[in-house]
């Protein structure tokens, strides 16, 4: 394409340019694929506009973007149903020890795995806090500059604690031995201090 000056990474179907106010979409001949990508990109348009309006309403004119894993995860979450393909990606990442925690998302930045993990995180957020957690996050966007702080203000839980709970839920879901029992850290408490025992 000559719409943008650089090459699109593999797996990028469409993109939203907020500053230019446009969305670019492919037309591969598959109407279901086109509709899914259109929904995904319209979620970006909606969320970028919502964040800008919330900030503007509170006199803040600097745009505070969300982390990419969240924006792409939310766009996937709101544009399609969870699939067995998503299960396959997460299971493979977990089994091969490549599953990234939220704090490690920069290692998989922009990859399909990041989109899938982000979608999984959004599903877990909705299950844990209720579907309206996303609206509450956006309405609180003006209250802090960092996503972690907005998350804490909205949910009452640190992003690190949430991350640990999300990773634990994936292990329970995909690792049969843990599903039958539990991790040692969840069943027992530490009885010793530092050093060798």
Question: Where would I find each of the regions flagged by the language model?
Answer:
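Juxtacatalytic substrate-recognition/specificity segment
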Residues: 1-61, 65-67, 85
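Short secondary-structure transition/capping segments
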Residues: 24-41, 101-107, 180-190
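Preference for long, solvent-exposed alpha-helical segments and helix-linker "stalks"
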Residues: 42-46, 74, 91-95
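Amphipathic, soluble alpha/beta structural segments
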Residues: 59-77, 172-179
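Beta/coil-rich, acidic/histidine-enriched accessory regions frequently appended to metallopeptidases
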Residues: 109-112, 136-139, 143-197
């Amino acid at each position: 394409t000559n719409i943008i000056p650089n090459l699109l990474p593999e797996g990028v179907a469409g993109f939203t340019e907020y500053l230019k106010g446009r969305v670019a979409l492919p037309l591969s001949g598959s109407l279901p694929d086109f509709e899914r990508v259109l929904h995904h990109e319209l979620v970006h348009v909606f969320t970028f506009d919502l964040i800008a309006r919330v900030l503007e309403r509170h006199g803040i004119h600097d745009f505070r973007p969300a982390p990419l894993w969240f924006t792409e995860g939310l766009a996937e979450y709101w544009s399609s149903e969870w699939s067995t393909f998503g299960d396959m990606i997460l299971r493979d990442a977990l089994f091969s020890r490549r599953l990234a925690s939220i704090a490690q998302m920069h290692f998989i930045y922009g990859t399909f795995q990041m989109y899938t993990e982000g979608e999984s995180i959004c599903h877990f957020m909705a299950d844990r806090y209720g579907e309206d957690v996303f609206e509450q996050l956006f309405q609180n966007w003006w209250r802090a500059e960092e996503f972690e702080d907005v998350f804490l203000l909205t949910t009452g839980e640190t992003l690190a604690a949430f991350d640990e709970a999300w990773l634990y839920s994936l292990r329970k879901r995909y690792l049969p031995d843990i599903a039958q029992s539990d991790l040692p850290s969840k069943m027992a408490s530490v009885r010793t201090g530092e050093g060798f025992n």
